[in-house]
């Protein structure tokens, strides 16, 4: 689903390839690798790569952190609402937005399982392959139990 909106899953393989155009130098290593893998999937489907958006990444990071610390797993934050509300509150003037979320326990490297899981879920796959999305940001949080919580947000302006 996506907003004009999007929503979705706890899932969890795709090859991690060299950096693609549009990578933000401020992304962390896992987020960077997810970004690269998602753009590789888009390239394989003859879609343009997504561009990194630092403000969207901040919103995604905040959502992952809140899910990990407040122990909920949802596109709807009990305090800050859905991705549309969270992006707007951060000053992101989106025209179209979407979100994929992922949570995993016990995996040393969540990149492959996150991307594979998203691609095997119709709603997540739709977000990744929506031609209208032009920008993305990804945020990851580690739980005290070692779990990974990942949020990828998409937008078009």
What is the role of each PLM region?
Residues 10-19:
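Bacterial N-terminal signal peptides
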Residues 11, 43, 64, 125-126:
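Hydrophobic alpha-helical segments, especially transmembrane helices
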Residues 20-24:
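Sec/Tat signal peptide C-region and signal peptidase I cleavage site
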